[in-house]
Amino acid sequence: DKVTLKNTHINFTDQFIRPNYRANLTELKGQIGPLHPGKAGKIDIRGTIDKSAPLQISGTIDPFSEQLSFDIATTIKGIDLPTFSPYSGRYIGHLIEKGKLSVDVNYQIQQGQLSAENKIFLDQLKIGEKVDSPDAVSLPLDLAISLLKNRKGEINLRFPVSGSIDDPKFSISG
C-alpha cells in the first residue's frame, strides 16, 4: 500500500532532444503512501540531482478519488544550467555557458481546479554560443536577460497558474 525509496537511483534521458538531455537522481529516500481509497496518502521524497542539487518533494495525493486530488510541493536548489543546453540550443538558439537554477513550486488540484505557485531563481545566467536550430524563437535574448537580472546577477521569477483542468481550453503553457 506504499512505495518506499531507500538510496534509489534514477538515470533519466530525454531522447527526443539532440543532443540528449540527461539527469541522474541519486540518494533518493522517502515514501509515497500509504495509499487507500478515500484517504490522501503522504509523499515525502528527498534526494540529489546530478550529485549537487538537493531535491525535495512533499505533499499528499489521493489517486483513488473520483476526481484527481493532490497538493505537492517540490524544491530543487542549484542545478547547473549548462546541462539544459540541449533545450536552450533547440528553442532559443544558444547554449548556456553558466548559471544555477533553483525551483520552488506548489501544485494543488481539488475538485478539478488547479492552483499553482511557481518560483524560479536563476543565478549568474550567462548565454553561450549561438547554434543553428529551426525551432529557435527570434527574440532579443541579451536584452531580456539584462532587464530581468538584478545588480547581483540574479533573476527571480514568480508566477501563479490556475484554472479548471476539465476546461478543454485550459493549458499550463498558455
What residue spans do the PLM features occupy?
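Extracellular loop and loop/strand-boundary signature of outer-membrane beta-barrel proteins
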Residues: 89-92
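Extended terminal
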Residues: 62, 66, 75, 94-100, ...
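Elongated, acidic membrane-bridging lipid-handling scaffolds
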Residues: 1-85, 163, 168, 174
